Design a protein with these regions (language model features):
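Conserved small/polar residues in nucleotide/adenosyl-binding loops
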Residues: 323-329
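N-terminal, active-site-proximal structural segment of metallo-dependent hydrolase catalytic domains
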Residues: 2-143, 147-161, 165-171
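Catalytic metal-binding/acid-base residues of hydrolase active sites
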Residues: 71, 122, 154-155, 181, ...
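His/acidic metal-ligating clusters that form di-metal
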Residues: 205-222, 232-276
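Beta-strand-turn-beta hairpins that frame and shape the catalytic cleft
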Residues: 55-65, 170, 174, 179-184, ...
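His/Asp/Glu-enriched short active-site or ligand-binding loop at hydrolase and phosphoryl-transfer sites
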Residues: 145-155, 280-321
């Protein structure tokens, strides 16, 4: 009799767990949504002692564009991420977010960019301790007036994994800062994987900021964050093809186009060989850009000095041990 009671109790517990799992799966799929194409607001920022914003962009002048993936304020040198085979799923503390965001902004500020692009900037996330990280970015343009554009990349349902410290629900986006006036901006939706994989691929987009030039044409500035952790690199290639088609249309209309961001691609084409590391088992998506993807008229500019090779991204399965180059700080 006692044995039957134990079996019945265990059966009820298992049934309850099964119901919870089913309800969670229903919640995740029901909560999943895509933001879609939309116009974006341009915010003009200034302080009491700020130098007035510079006039329209001049042709023939030299301008500096920076790009940095903020990694939701988590990626200190010794941080490892669970999706890369590491151990951690969130920033370690509010203090860690503060220190990392200040460090990223200080580095970018030191470059004195005319245009600064940021990716994976959380506005409200479990993984980033619900800190609005956009508040840090204005310091990158300290001392001058500037325009700011924010595009929400994704608004994910609660990811109950890893079980001990779930990644949680996260709202994250991309931010563009400009010392020159931005006339208008828009969000463009990118294709993502289908089925269950779309829950890991999240939502993806790029923002388009239109900046007038003295010649009457526009500087069209693209800020992007392509897919990572997909089954292979095919979807990011498809996204890149869409971006290139958009840029080529602007180029043929006489406008000037620059795209920067986190490509989640091996931009050098042979990063493991260059940096003397073995490709990790989780690196199936960080593939070289297939030949012919970038059309004539557009050029891929990779920040790389062959005499002094420095990777733009480290693999995150171990604390700051292995490095690759995909023009991003994380994914």
């Amino acid at each position: 009799m006692k044995g039957k009671t134990i079996c019945k109790t265990l059966g009820l517990v298992l049934l309850a767990l099964l119901i919870l799992v089913v309800l969670y799966v229903v919640y995740v799929f029901a909560s999943y949504h895509r933001v879609g194409d939309q116009s974006l607001s341009v915010m003009h920022c200034s302080s009491r002692d700020a130098v007035p914003m510079e006039d329209a962009v001049e042709t023939g002048a030299v301008y500096r564009v920076s790009s940095a993936n903020a990694g939701f304020g988590a990626y200190s040198a010794d941080y490892s991420f669970f999706m890369d085979g590491g151990r951690e799923s969130r920033a370690r503390s509010r203090q860690a977010v503060d220190e990392n965001m200040r460090g990223i902004v200080a580095f970018v500020k030191g470059l004195s960019p005319d245009f600064a692009l940021f990716q994976e900037v959380d506005t409200d996330g479990t993984r980033s301790w619900h800190i609005d990280e956009t508040a840090y970015l204005s310091d990158a343009m300290t001392g001058c007036e500037f325009d700011e554009v924010f595009a929400q990349n994704y608004d994910s349902p609660y990811l109950f994994y890893p079980l001990i410290q779930p990644h949680g629900a996260n709202q994250s986006g991309i931010v563009t800062l400009s010392r020159h006036p931005i006339a208008s901006a828009a969000r463009r939706e990118l294709p993502v994987e289908s089925g269950f994989m779309k829950l890991l691929d999240l939502d993806r987009c790029y923002s388009v900021s239109r900046i007038p030039t003295a010649s009457g044409k526009e500087l069209v500035l693209y800020n992007l964050h392509l897919s990572a952790y997909t089954s292979d690199g095919a979807i990011a290639t498809e996204q890149l093809e869409l971006l290139c088609a958009d840029m080529l249309a602007e180029y043929e209309a006489g406008n000037y186009c620059v795209a920067g961001g986190d490509f989640n691609k091996d931009l050098l084409g042979n990063s493991p060989e260059i940096f003397g590391v073995a490709a990790g088992e989780n690196d199936t998506w960080a593939q070289p850009i297939p030949e012919g993807t970038i059309p004539d008229g557009l050029s891929l500019v990779v920040p790389f000095d062959p005499e002094h090779p420095v990777a733009t991204c480290r693999t995150a399965n171990e604390p700051c041990l292995l490095y690759t180059s995909d023009a991003a700080d994380d994914s």
